[in-house]
Amino acid sequence: MKIYVDADACPVKKEIERVATRNKIVVLLVSNGGLRPILNPFIQNIFVSTDADAADKWIVDNGHANDLVITADIILADNCIKKGMLVLKPNGEELNQKNIGNSLSLRDFSSDLRAANPFYQGSGKTFSKQDKIRFLDSLEKVVRINNQNSRPT
């Protein structure tokens, strides 16, 4: 398993680095160049063009089934799930075949609300310490399951 991170606006990069280093998992931080490189043998900094969705396309093109993707981008999550990849949002919520349809519908509904009312800005919920804790719990669970499944029997 590798971990692909839609890194430009990801608030949990340090947490991902800690868990990945402890478990010796390769992490690919994919961004359009707006990040300071992390010097860690388990972290690869992938810089893509500034074209719209270039990082998303790179992740989908390079990821494989059972790799993990960290993103808040619902469209990217949907494309990764279709390839058999695992997806976690930075708040720890797992996205999968069972719930991605609801997430896509909510995204479309919110987009329609913004289009109909330019003063509607959405919930604006800030990223909290609880979100970070929930993310770490979810990431540790995925890594633990991966480690159990990759052991020789």
Whereabouts are the PLM-identified features?
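Nuclease catalytic cores that cleave nucleic-acid phosphodiester bonds
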Residues: 2-153
